[in-house]
């Protein structure tokens, strides 16, 4: 898939997601972001995705086949975060878009809470250009960049609202700095 993406979108990937359990956290511009993010990792990523993607059989089948984790965005979804925590403790990697939507907004503290509970590193990723690829009535093929930052090493412990909020702020700044 990487050669096709490089050809169609002039895709440029800087850096790689490190092997081993980690939490990949990226900005969210379009529905192209999950496959672009998957191209940065040598191991499968389990995406936390809005539960609405499971409402229809084709979407449910695809999300299950890709190891997706359904999450309710209208409230704290402790069941989904618990499933993500189990995967991290089993050596798997999890991907999350802390903005929760392609329209932007405040970053949720879920990625920070997972990192604090498991000690898994947070990997900041910036995706540039995917919004332009799917804007308007026709598909465009702009230049796309995916920049993987240095992992944020986090000490495992009991997350408090203050520590999760502070870590989320640092993560957001790291993602924004990747240009």
Question: Language-model segments: what does each one mean?
Answer:
Residues 16-75, 83:
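Catalytic core of membrane glycerolipid acyltransferases/transacylases, capturing the structured
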């Amino acid at each position: 898939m990487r050669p096709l993406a490089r050809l169609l979108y002039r895709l440029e990937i800087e850096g790689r997601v490190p092997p081993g359990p980690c939490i990949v956290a990226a900005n969210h511009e379009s529905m192209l972001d999950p496959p672009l993010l998957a191209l940065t990792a040598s191991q499968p990523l389990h995406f936390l995705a809005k539960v609405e993607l499971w409402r229809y059989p084709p979407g449910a089948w695809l999300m299950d086949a890709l190891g997706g984790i359904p999450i309710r965005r209208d409230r704290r979804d402790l069941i989904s975060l618990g499933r993500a925590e189990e995967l991290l403790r089993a050596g798997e990697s999890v991907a999350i878009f802390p903005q929760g939507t392609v329209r932007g907004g405040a970053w949720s503290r879920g990625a920070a809470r997972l990192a604090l509970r498991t000690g898994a590193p947070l990997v900041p990723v910036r995706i540039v250009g995917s919004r332009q690829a799917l804007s308007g009535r026709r598909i465009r093929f702009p230049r796309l960049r995916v920049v993987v930052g240095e992992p944020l090493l986090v000490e495992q412990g009991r997350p408090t609202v203050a520590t999760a909020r502070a870590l989320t702020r640092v993560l957001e700044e790291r993602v924004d700095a990747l240009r």
